[in-house]
Amino acid sequence: MKIPARLKPNSRHREEVVVGSDGTYIIYTKAPAIEGRANAAAIKLLAKYFGVPQSRVKLVRGARAKHKVFLIDI
């Protein structure tokens, strides 16, 4: 299934996934948006949230943007 998400890198919050009022997943991560570190952290958090291995979570759109689309193979 495709998951629309908004990534919040360098977050002071704890690392977590929250569902927004519009159905978009908001991903808070402490990783910086440098060299794909925030994207890797987002994949790890989404895998934990949905209870699937990290290999089943793929970034489909938005590799260099805050608004992203992930594909999760459940």
Predicted regions and their residues:
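Contiguous, often N-terminal, cationic amphipathic patches that form binding interfaces
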Residues: 1-36, 40-43, 52-54, 58-64, ...
